[in-house]
């Protein structure tokens, strides 16, 4: 019934198995991949005919984690998986980025890749396995895919590279780098690092590329057994049309791409395009070509004009040379009520970045296959349509916004202070108000400034820069601080963020084969120069964290109480802690180890809450005087609440000097009194006295009398 084929190799000290022919047999390609006890299913289906009216590759990649893979039931009311989580969105992009450039030009068939996590062993993150499985399924599917690709995660522990570190090793690593590519070239890099050098980062990329070669060989071996016949793809020769169009509009297109201002340039290019379309579609005549085809040729011609100009003259669209960074204006403290804010402008790219400090109540609970954890640093990136002069629908967060936000998050996280030293929840929001390339790196620069403006003690300021590449045969140009057009028309998008000490984040997407180690080395070196320059410009606004927190930010005080006192502080059903919060106005968070965090923007509120909590968590001392409230009046005395939630008895004989007939003659419920702790009886009950305390001044009368009695003797002795 099943026509199974499988390949198994040892990879990084664990078995990797790829199997096809048993599950999801109606898909064009389906592979079950197993690494350790982590299992994923990758499927590929491509439509039989091209999608009409599109001039792009209609590829969709969906990665989904099923909670049953970890032996869990989803939370929430419906008890089933809902919309994609941030992790699922990020891994979907991780799979998409290296496979998209490998589809044949002209492939317009709707193609869907779905990767489902079936089992998670809590050691091997499914994302790398998902990339491998998707590559294998595409290779088997018959779609015009110029793969396969391999992928690997690289760590850096004790000055050594580690292939596919397990989850328990991740806290120890100074680097988390994911690299993917073909047998000949690196296509994609995603990483977070603790201020590592360019040499270490490049070494990690090449280490990963070398070590996923056995995976590529395994996929090829599986394809030799089970791959479907390649789909036929008719490639149309447009060279004659391109030659005719070049003669018609070359000079005007070159002139348009010499206009430095984006909106003016787009208007000029639009007029040239109208001229080309009018030429190929004369009024009153039957069209000889498809409009999308002519538009596609024009787009190719745009790319060639820009690329030729850069390689021939060394000048870019806006007149810069390859190494120059656009003019920068950095401002901090631009919003009066925000805890921290910055406006970072680089050329025609601008980010308004705002930092908000919160408490433990504001931490984000993340429910993942590996378990639930709390995230104390959040960075959100918003890209409204007005930032590029367009209209558009505002709705849910798009995949691109999630991806760019995570890139900036990775760049900033390594320089944040440890949570035990700075116990705040930090949320950074980057609003892209203008965009012409490198908005994610503008977010990094703005985030660094906004955090320092809020008083967050970063290890060092952090900046980011986007690099590009033009490669034609043996000639190439590495471009610093690329424009949007240079991103779209170039061969590489290479984003580097870090401090003056080293790199904190590196993201690379390469659209072509042939990017050598030497080219990447040049790009990293040029990126470092650009990063140092940007840090210098940022320092004109703010070069270190402000000494005080933002005026409107909450203050947090941290202290510890004995763990056996936690229950008393919280109270039955949370009664006591709710009362503390309501009456003091402070937020209180108590952790299992007895760590207490008290937060408020009002210092007096914090002091009152701390005093209250400490009075509950510590024991009263015999002989000390305390303020209290009469809570119950009895014939034999009065019960007084003192020292937080503690109650003690003032016996009728201890209410006042002289004989007291009735307790109610001296006190009534609600009275504020001063009491001295006499001690505890045989049953542990607290004994208090009002008689020995001056109710006006709180003075200890016994101690006063004793001192007065000793004074004459002391005088005589002298």
Curated annotation (Swiss-Prot):
Record keywords: Cytoplasm, Magnesium, Metal-binding, Nucleotidyltransferase, RNA-binding, Transferase
Residue ranges of every copy of the KH domain listed in the record: 554-613
Positions with a binding annotation for Mg(2+): 487, 493
Superkingdom, natural source: Bacteria
GO molecular function: 3'-5'-RNA exonuclease activity; magnesium ion binding; polyribonucleotide nucleotidyltransferase activity; RNA binding
Known EC number: 2.7.7.8
A Gene Ontology biological process term: RNA processing
InterPro entries named in the record: ExoRNase_PH_dom1 (IPR001247), ExoRNase_PH_dom2 (IPR015847), ExoRNase_PH_dom2_sf (IPR036345), KH_dom (IPR004087), KH_dom_type_1 (IPR004088), KH_dom_type_1_sf (IPR036612), NA-bd_OB-fold (IPR012340), PNPase (IPR012162)
Subcellular locations according to the entry: Cytoplasm
Record domain S1 motif: where: 623-691
Primary residence: cytoplasm
Described purpose of this protein according to its UniProt entry: Involved in mRNA degradation. Catalyzes the phosphorolysis of single-stranded polyribonucleotides processively in the 3'- to 5'-direction.
Family as reported in the entry's similarity comment: Belongs to the polyribonucleotide nucleotidyltransferase family.
Database matches in HAMAP family: PNPase
Protein name in UniProt: Polyribonucleotide nucleotidyltransferase
Gene this protein is translated from: pnp
């Amino acid at each position: 019934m099943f026509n199974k084929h499988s390949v198994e190799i040892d990879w990084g000290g664990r078995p990797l198995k790829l199997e096809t022919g048993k599950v999801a047999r109606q898909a064009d390609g389906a592979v079950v991949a197993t690494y350790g006890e982590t299992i994923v299913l990758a499927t590929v289906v491509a439509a039989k005919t091209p999608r009409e009216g599109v001039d792009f590759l209609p590829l969709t990649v969906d990665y989904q984690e099923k909670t049953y893979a970890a032996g869990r039931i989803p939370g929430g009311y419906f008890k089933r998986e809902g919309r994609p989580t941030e992790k699922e969105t990020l891994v979907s992009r991780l799979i998409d980025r290296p496979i998209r450039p490998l589809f044949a030009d002209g492939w317009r068939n709707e193609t869907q890749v779905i990767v489902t996590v079936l089992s998670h062993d809590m050691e091997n993150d499914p994302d790398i396995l998902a990339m491998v499985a998707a590559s294998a399924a595409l290779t088997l599917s018959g779609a015009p895919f110029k793969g396969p690709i391999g992928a690997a995660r690289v760590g850096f522990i004790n000055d050594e590279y580690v292939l596919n570190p397990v989850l328990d090793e991740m806290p120890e690593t100074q680097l988390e780098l994911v690299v993917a590519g073909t047998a000949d070239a690196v296509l994609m890099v995603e990483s977070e690092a603790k201020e590592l050098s360019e040499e270490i980062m490049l070494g990690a990329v090449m280490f990963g590329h070398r070590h996923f070669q056995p995976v590529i060989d395994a996929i090829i071996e599986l394809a030799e057994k089970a791959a479907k016949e390649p789909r036929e793809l008719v490639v149309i020769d447009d060279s004659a049309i391109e030659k005719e169009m070049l003669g018609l509009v070359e000079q005007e297109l070159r002139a348009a791409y010499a206009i430095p201002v984006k909106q003016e340039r787009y208007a000029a290019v639009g007029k040239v395009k109208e001229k080309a379309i009018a030429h190929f579609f004369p009024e009153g005549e039957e069209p000889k070509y498809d409009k999308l085809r002519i538009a596609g040729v024009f787009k190719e011609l745009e790319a060639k004009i820009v690329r030729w100009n850069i390689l021939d003259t060394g000048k870019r669209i806006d007149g810069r040379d390859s190494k120059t960074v656009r003019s920068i204006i950095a401002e901090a403290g631009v919003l009066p009520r925000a805890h921290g804010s910055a406006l970072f402008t680089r050329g025609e790219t601008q980010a308004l970045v705002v930092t908000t400090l919160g408490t433990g109540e504001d931490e984000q609970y993340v429910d993942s296959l590996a378990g639930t954890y709390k995230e104390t640093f959040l960075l959100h990136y918003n890209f409204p349509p007005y930032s590029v002069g367009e209209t558009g629908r505002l709705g849910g967060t798009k995949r691109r916004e999630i991806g760019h936000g995570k890139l900036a998050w990775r760049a900033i996280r390594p320089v944040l202070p440890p949570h035990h030293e700075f116990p705040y929840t930090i949320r950074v929001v980057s609003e892209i108000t203008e965009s012409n390339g490198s908005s994610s790196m503008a977010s990094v620069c703005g985030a660094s400034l906004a955090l320092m403006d809020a008083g967050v003690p970063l290890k060092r300021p952090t900046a980011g820069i986007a690099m590009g590449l033009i490669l034609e045969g043996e000639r190439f140009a590495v471009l610093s601080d690329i424009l949007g057009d240079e991103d779209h028309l170039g061969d590489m998008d290479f984003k580097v963020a870090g401090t003056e000490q080293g790199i904190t984040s590196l993201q690379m997407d390469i659209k072509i084969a042939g990017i050598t180690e030497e080219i990447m080395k040049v790009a990293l070196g040029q990126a470092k120069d650009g990063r140092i320059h940007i840090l210098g410009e940022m320092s004109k606004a703010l070069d270190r964290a402000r000494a005080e927190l933002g005026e409107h930010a909450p203050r947090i005080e941290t202290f510890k109480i004995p763990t056996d006192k936690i229950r008393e502080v919280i109270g039955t059903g949370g009664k006591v802690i709710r009362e503390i919060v309501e009456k003091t106005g402070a937020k209180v968070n108590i952790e299992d180890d007895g760590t207490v965090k008290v937060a408020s923007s009002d210092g007096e509120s914090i002091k009152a809450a701390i005093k209250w909590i400490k009075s509950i968590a510590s024991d009263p001392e015999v002989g000390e005087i305390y303020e209290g409230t009469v809570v119950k009046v009895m014939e034999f005395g009065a019960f007084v609440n003192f020292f937080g939630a503690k109650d003690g008895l003032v016996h009728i004989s201890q209410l006042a000097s002289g004989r007291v007939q009735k307790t109610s003659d001296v006190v009534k419920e609600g009275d504020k009194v001063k009491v001295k702790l006499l001690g505890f009886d045989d049953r542990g009950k607290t004994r208090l006295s009002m008689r020995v305390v001056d109710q006006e001044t709180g003075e200890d009368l016994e101690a006063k009398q004793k001192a007065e009695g000793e004074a004459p003797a002391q005088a005589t002795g002298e």
